[in-house]
A protein has these predicted regions:
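Divalent metal-coordination and catalytic microenvironments
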Residues: 12, 33, 56, 67, ...
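Active-site-adjacent beta->alpha loops and helix N-cap segments on the catalytic face
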Residues: 106-113, 163-175
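Short, small-residue-biased leader/transition segments that mark boundaries at the very start
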Residues: 227-232
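Metal-associated gating/positioning segment near the N- to mid-region
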Residues: 54-119
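Active-site gating/metal-coordination segments in enzymes
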Residues: 128-172
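N-terminal metal-binding scaffold of metallo-dependent hydrolase/deaminase domains
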Residues: 1-46
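Active-site metal-binding motif and surrounding structural segment of the metallo-beta-lactamase
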Residues: 42-59
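Alpha-helix-loop-beta-strand connector modules within alpha/beta enzyme cores
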Residues: 109-126, 175-185
Length: 240
């Protein structure tokens, strides 16, 4: 959209924080890339350079996906930042958070800045790189949080690798509190799920297959939310 151009979106069903799940029929006037007016469908909009018929479509703010796997760098045979961004944009997502399970992992400033720059180059949606909780997502040593935060990272996760060491996770929570960053822990005690192929229960017992107990998740959630800290329990605000 060029600077100063106007667009009218007519006949769509508005779905946002002001509506219920059914939305409401309304028309939208956009000027210079900014929503200037939303009016009921039967009312007139100002004239515009372009008119879009959105009959039968949903018109909403852009969606944000907090967990995507763009695979770049290192696993481009599965996905790239450009192809993942294109898929996101086609689905109505204007921002995505890229998980750090790349090769190398997003545990250094240079990798984080590469991911962000590739997102800008693609120019299809905002690509927000996350950082690792631990170096290489290996659960052995904490990633350099201050360095990554200075590079613009605010969300840290080891993606599908839960941090198994309680002391290491406690240290991570303390840093998260002090640096005002957010941790996303994969809630799984891996020693309880080794070899599991389905939920634990009567079905897996009948089939003779190893089950995945709910306790594996419950224990990790309880552990994270029970950690004492030296100052307060504010660390709980730092975990999602």
């Amino acid at each position: 959209m060029r600077e100063g151009q106007t667009i009218n979106i007519r006949g769509g069903r508005i779905l946002d924080e002001t509506t219920d799940a059914q939305g409401r029929l309304a028309d939208v006037h956009i000027s210079g890339g900014v929503i200037a007016e939303v009016v009921e469908a039967e009312l007139k909009l100002p004239k515009a350079d372009f008119d879009l018929d959105a009959t039968g479509c949903i018109v909403s703010p852009g969606f944000v996906d907090l967990h995507v796997h763009l695979r770049e760098p290192g696993r481009e045979e599965s996905e790239t930042i450009e192809t993942g961004s294109r898929a996101a944009a086609l689905g109505g997502f204007t921002a995505v958070v890229a998980m750090p399970n790349t090769e190398p992992s997003q545990d250094s400033r240079i990798v984080v800045e590469f991911v962000r720059s590739q997102g800008v180059r693609a120019g299809l949606c905002e690509v927000v790189p996350s950082g690792c909780i631990t170096v290489g997502r290996a659960g052995q040593a904490l990633a350099p949080y201050s360095e990554l935060r200075d590079a613009g990272v605010t969300l840290f996760t080891d993606d599908g690798n839960g941090v198994q060491d309680p002391l290491l996770m406690r240290r991570a929570l303390e840093y998260a509190r002090d640096l005002n960053i957010t941790l996303a822990q994969h809630c799984e005690v891996s020693s309880l799920t080794a070899g599991a192929v389905m939920h634990e229960g009567s079905c897996c017992s009948h089939l003779g297959l190893p089950g995945w107990p709910a306790l594996a998740e419950e224990l990790m959630v309880h552990r994270v939310h029970s950690f004492p800290t030296r100052r307060s329990s504010d660390h709980r605000k730092s975990v999602v």
